[in-house]
Design a protein with these regions (language model features):
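Generic enzyme active-site microenvironment
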Residues: 33, 112, 168
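N-terminal entry segment of metal-dependent catalytic domains or homologous docking segments
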Residues: 1-56, 115, 145-157, 214-221
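Short acidic-glycine loop/turn motifs at beta-strand connectors
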Residues: 24-27, 102-106, 120-124, 224-228
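Catalytic core of PPM/PP2C metal-dependent serine/threonine phosphatase domains
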Residues: 50, 63-120, 152-159, 212-215
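Acidic loop->beta-strand submotif enriched in PP2C/PPM serine/threonine phosphatases
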Residues: 14-24, 29, 90-104, 108, ...
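PP2C/PPM family metal-dependent serine/threonine protein phosphatase catalytic domain
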Residues: 2-15, 78-88, 119-160, 196, ...
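Short helix/loop capping segments that flank catalytic or ligand/cofactor-binding pockets
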Residues: 41, 119-120, 175-177
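C-terminal catalytic subdomain
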Residues: 16, 84, 148-228
Length: 228
């Protein structure tokens, strides 16, 4: 497996409000990405602590994840997030959440808020992305004091052949953000980079992501089949 990511601070930002983790756990791999809400002064802490909470809760979970409701797992992550932020004003720590959990024969993914994730398996690309159907462009769902389970979008699948997964914050827009745009981008990314080393992949992503249009923070995390 090749995994990693790149996060670039946006123009005019004092601190990068995005955070990501992409690394192995037990028999699988976790990608978790979060974008701190721009209007919140401590949202960079919110994004950091939810990524760390998700990784720690899932990697230390003692039971079979394949039979547990993923929303229940996210609830546990949310509770851990609140514990880690107990010394801060939680109202200033709101953040989005994107997760891909790749296990030996199943994948679970979740989205709360903007950004997108894609999963390339069995020669098909599946995705979760923010269609902005019920919000203005700068509005989104996010982690707050109470977890809004109804607005968590879940994707679960079994697979035979895993090829890759990408998770991006909303600073990275792909074309017109339609399903064919996400499908083509994912396939091209995996085809281009799956035969390169982690160091080569990260260096090349940095070279073009720094010039990506837009002034927001930009984060892309990935995992692909290939040589580490």
């Amino acid at each position: 497996m090749i995994s990693g990511g790149v996060s670039i601070i946006g123009n005019y930002h004092g601190v990068n409000q995005d955070y990501f983790i992409s690394k192995p756990y037990k028999d699988g791999h976790i990608i978790v990405v979060s974008d701190g809400i721009g209007s919140k002064s401590l949202s960079h802490l919110g994004s950091k602590y939810i990524c760390e909470s998700v990784y720690d809760v899932i990697s230390n979970y003692a039971f079979d994840l394949s039979v547990i409701s993923f929303k229940d797992i996210i609830y546990m992550c949310h509770e851990e997030w609140k514990k880690r932020l107990v010394d801060y004003d939680l109202k200033e720590c709101y953040a989005t959440l994107l997760i891909v959990l790749i296990s030996e024969n199943f994948i679970k993914a979740a989205r709360l808020g903007d950004g997108f994730l894609t999963i390339y398996a069995d020669d098909k690309v599946s995705f979760l992305y923010d269609k902005k159907e019920n919000y203005f462009a700068n509005e989104t769902d996010c982690l707050k004091e109470v977890l809004d389970r109804d607005n968590i979008e879940i994707l679960e699948m079994n697979y035979l052949k895993f090829q890759g997964a990408l998770v991006c914050t909303d600073g990275i827009e792909i074309g017109r953000m339609q399903e064919y745009d996400l499908t083509n981008f994912t396939k091209e990314f995996v085809d281009e980079y799956s035969n390169k080393s982690q160091e080569e992949v990260i260096t090349e992503i940095e070279s073009w992501l720094v010039d990506w249009p837009g002034i927001d923070d930009k984060t892309l995390a990935f995992v692909m089949e290939g040589e580490n």
